[in-house]
Curated annotation (Swiss-Prot):
Alphabetized UniProt keyword annotations: Cytoplasm, Ribonucleoprotein, Ribosomal protein
UniProt source species: Candida albicans (strain SC5314 / ATCC MYA-2876)
GO molecular function: mRNA binding; structural constituent of ribosome
Name of the protein this chain belongs to: Large ribosomal subunit protein uL29
Segments traversing the membrane: none
Length: 120
């Protein structure tokens, strides 16, 4: 098995991916044993990268499923939330920023902004 293509992995089911992962890990184990007799085995590199690709696709699928589960819910796990910056995460929402105290509301109503007309 040469390089595994990621676009091919994305079409496979979870069971197929897990079985392929087991096969790749077994192949890696045999290659590690062969390395003792014959050093400088470049095949180990490709097998390790293939294992990483399979694991990446499995993790992406899991995160996608969890994201779909929490879609529309009030609370979302922190690792699925938008990263943003610390300051942006703490920023007031539009609704919170528009709130005003009762005293400020009464003052705004009692003393509206004056409108001036200019003589032409």
């Amino acid at each position: 098995m040469a390089g595994v293509k990621t676009f091919e992995l994305r079409t496979k089911s979870k069971e197929q991916l897990e079985s392929q992962l087991v096969e790749l890990k077994q192949e890696l184990a045999t290659l590690k044993v062969q390395k003792l007799q014959r050093p400088s085995l470049p095949r180990i590199h490709t097998v390790r990268k293939n294992i990483a690709r399979v694991l990446t696709v499995i993790n992406l699928n899991q995160r996608e499923n969890v994201r779909a589960f929490y879609a529309g819910k009030k609370y979302i796990p922190k690792d699925l939330r938008a990263k943003k910056t610390r300051a942006l995460r703490r920023k007031l929402t539009k609704f919170e920023a528009s709130q005003e105290t009762e005293k400020a509301r009464k003052q705004r109503i009692a003393f509206p902004q004056r409108k001036f007309a200019i003589k032409a």
